[in-house]
Swiss-Prot record:
Protein name: Adenine deaminase
Domain of life: Bacteria
GO biological process: adenine catabolic process
Subunit structure of this chain's protein: Homodimer.
Name of the coding gene: ade
SUPFAM superfamilies on file: Composite domain of metallo-dependent hydrolases, Metallo-dependent hydrolases
Spans traversing the lipid bilayer: none
Annotated keywords: Hydrolase, Manganese
GO molecular function, one term: adenine deaminase activity
Keyword Transferase appears in the UniProt entry: no
Primary enzyme class: hydrolase
Listed InterPro entries: Adenine_deam, Adenine_deam_C, Amidohydro-rel, Metal-dep_hydrolase_composite, Metal_Hydrolase
Pfam short name (any one): Adenine_deam_C
Length: 588
């Protein structure tokens, strides 16, 4: 990527430079001086002793030579360790079910000062209007909220019904927006490898920025071809050797630890002094309960240090500087002169205990963020409105006919992974030859009046009841899993009535439900309220059987055709390895 991209983001006037230089020389008064602090050296390792002086949004100087520097305000760090603000290299804020405003309130006090966001969830539902709203939120945010322009809406052409398109012409209209860092994950990797001109046109249009990848399990000549097209990174790696090979071929590796896809344990052993500038941390999809109880990028850093013995400076490097360099955000990622003053003060660097956060040179107050949240959300003009164009359903809509002696395909879930296996099961008069088979259905919600696409699901752990949601990647149709058609219908009708959301049904009754009024994806509740509601949903879901740790996030990926092996879209069963539809009955 061309380093000149930094000029797009690093806006500083000549007057600001002169003021900054004057403070650096010791000829002018700083705005803030952070004293009694040690600075973690991400380049050499070890620590730098001495103050940090700040003028405006930027660091003017670091080190003992500024011990007596004049400043308008002094911050006593009380022996804390200072590190750069954390950066999430790839996420979909919508998957937190929070608005970008609420997400900032929940994560900025945890040290997450920068996010690289792909808003393709809301773009799949409402098109350019969704992207425009995210841009408005980013413009007013204290947090550095950067956007990658969604590249695959829908995820795979012709495989699902979604709510809107996002054409190249529309994408280009956002390319020069000050918050746009590049092109979001190019999920149609077979199309890129085969040289489809429509996809190459998108890559060419954003080649001077950053080109995000998406290629789970890809190897050999296909991986070489994908990288040849200009793809620069991947967040979908889930095996050690897969990650190593991508690094060898020049890709940057995003190590993901989300609520469903948990790849940190598999990939953390790769990180070392040599390759850490090419390694980054990301969450992709993380729900509000985990953010509240475990953390965000801070939780990933903690695990690298405590569970994988990654040296402190390397762990914090991959959480900040590596990502800033990759995206051309050269004003971020280091505590050094001329860099933006995004600073996290840690009372315990090994446990990632956040004491105080500064962003753009100003201390962050969590209570102020909470108090201003409602007004700032209203200022962003959220795109309210019911996006569920689906009539209520009945149990007969989920009726499947099976023939004794026949074999049927089953989507087999792998807990805490996005990939699935494709297995089969024989049906007899007593049912299937395995007792963990549930029913799954996907119902398009955009007014096409299609019959539900139905299939079989194994390994999910559902012993009774039903779960339904409008969070269903990436087209966000209605997905429902159940043991009976009656309870599946009840769950679906509840989310239709709510205008989108999540629902748990058991014993013929709705046990818990969460309305998501923005695009059927996001709530307008506070982060704390949302976490409590998620807690109630998870508790209700656990009564239905030994489900995955995050059942709704795991369920949401069962309809995403660009991740192998077997998925179900509104169009039917899809073989994610052959990239073709297949039948429920095994006929070969």
């Amino acid at each position: 990527m061309n380093n000149s991209i930094n000029h797009k983001f690093h806006h500083i006037s000549r007057a600001e430079y002169q003021e900054l230089l004057a403070v650096s020389r010791g000829d002018a008064v700083a705005d803030y001086l952070i004293d009694n602090v040690s600075i973690l050296d991400l380049i050499n390792g070890g620590e730098i002793s001495g103050p940090i002086v700040i003028k405006g949004r930027y660091i003017a100087g670091v080190g003992a030579e500024y011990a007596d520097a004049p400043a308008l305000q002094r911050i006593d760090a009380r022996g804390a360790t200072a590190v750069p603000g954390f950066i999430d290299a790839h996420l979909h804020i919508e998957s937190s079910m929070m608005t970008p405003v609420t997400f900032e309130t929940a994560t900025l006090p945890r040290g997450l000062t920068t996010v690289i966001c792909d808003p393709h969830e809301i773009v799949n539902v409402m098109g350019e209007a969704g992207f425009a709203w995210f841009a408005r939120c980013a413009e007013q945010a204290r947090q550095n909220q950067y956007l990658q322009v969604s590249s695959c809406v829908p995820a795979l052409e012709g495989c699902d019904v979604n709510g809107a398109s996002f054409t190249l012409e529309q994408m280009l209209a956002w390319r020069d927006h000050p918050q746009v860092t590049g092109l979001a994950e190019m999920m149609d990797y077979p199309g890129v490898i085969s040289g489809q001109n429509a996809l190459l046109d998108k890559l060419d249009a954003f080649r001077h920025l950053t080109l995000d990848g998406h290629c789970p399990g890809l190897g050999g000549k296909e991986l070489n071809a994908y990288i040849t097209a200009g793809i620069e990174n991947c967040h979908e790696s889930y095996q050690l050797e897969e990650g190593r090979r991508k690094l060898q071929l020049g890709m940057s590796l995003m190590i993901r630890e989300g609520s469903a896809a948990r790849n940190l344990n598999a990939l953390a052993p790769l990180i070392n002094e040599f390759n850490s500038p090419q390694c980054m941390l990301c969450t992709d999809d993380r729900n509000p309960w985990e953010i509240a109880h475990e953390g965000h990028i801070d939780a990933l850093i903690r695990r690298l240090i405590e569970q994988h013995n990654v040296p402190l400076h390397v762990a914090y490097r991959v959480a900040s500087w590596s990502t800033a360099r990759h995206f051309g955000l050269n004003h971020l990622g280091l505590l050094a002169p001329g860099k933006q003053a995004d600073i996290v003060l840690l009372s315990d660097a090994r446990k990632v205990t956040v004491q105080q956060v500064l962003v753009k040179g100003e201390p962050i107050d969590a209570q102020t963020l909470q108090a201003e949240e409602s007004a700032r959300l209203a200022q962003s003009a959220p795109p309210y409105g019911n996006t569920i164009a689906r009539q209520p359903v009945s149990a007969s809509d989920f009726a499947l006919q099976f023939t004794p002696g026949k074999r049927y395909r089953v989507i087999d879930v792998i807990h805490n992974e996005l990939i699935t296996h494709s297995h089969s099961s024989v049906y007899s008069e007593n049912g299937f030859d395995r007792d963990d088979v549930s029913f799954i259905a996907v119902l398009e919600r955009y007014g096409q009046r299609l019959a539900p696409a139905c299939g079989l699901l194994g390994g999910f752990g559902l012993n009774e009841g039903a779960l339904a949601a409008t969070v269903s990647h990436d087209s966000h149709n209605i997905v429902v899993i159940g043991r009976s058609a009656e309870e599946m219908a009840l769950a679906v009708n509840q989310v239709i009535q709510d205008g989108g959301g999540l629902c748990v049904v058991r014993n013929g009754q709705v046990q818990s439900h969460l309305p998501l009024p923005i695009a059927g994806l996001m709530s307008t509740d506070t982060a704390q309220s949302l976490a409590e509601q998620i807690d109630a949903l998870k508790a209700a879901a656990r009564e239905c059987g030994p489900l995955p740790d995050e059942p709704f996030i795991q369920m949401a990926f069962l309809s995403l055709p660009v991740i192998p092996a077997l998925k179900l879209t509104s169009q039917g069963l899809f073989d994610g390895e052959k990239f073709a539809f297949t039948t429920l009955e095994v006929t070969e």
